[in-house]
């Protein structure tokens, strides 16, 4: 008997779970991936491809375990998004490329966590996470506290959202989520004005840059936002004049 066969026989005899030598996030340990970047950069595509990759990986995992004579089950995988995102379909995450997956829309962190726990979801994919802006009694973003609790419960969480608002400032809970994330994929789009790498969302109202003091949350697609680089990004001030942060820095 070869060494590998001896090891397999030992595992079967000792009844060591298959997960101990091929561990999965969501059942054996917690893992948080926070996908960020600009508008139209591919964040939702990343989330959608992750959804299909996880389902395929689990099919392979279960077949491999069964060949070893060990019974394991695939992880429960489910996608969510904030109900504030009404751009395409309420029950789907749809990327700008047209790719889509089914999802459940929720309007609060409490409803999100309740659904994950009630349905025993091992892998939760959450789009537009920047809209979960409610805070707990401790003053912390509720989505951050929820993520920590879910990670302690060995859940696999993949979140996607804008890292900056239309002013170029950290968007809601994203900065705190990035601080606790185990993986941080970042995506850059192309400036709609000059074609340079774009890291800022430009909000447009009737074709003109938005005011600095406008509400942070305004859900839209191409008609209200476009990706821009730092040189082309503009904001309207109270004096009805446009400001560009890069130009302001050069003047210092």
Model-assigned labels for residue ranges:
Residues 48, 52, 144, 148-151:
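A structural alpha-helix within SAM-dependent methyltransferase catalytic domains
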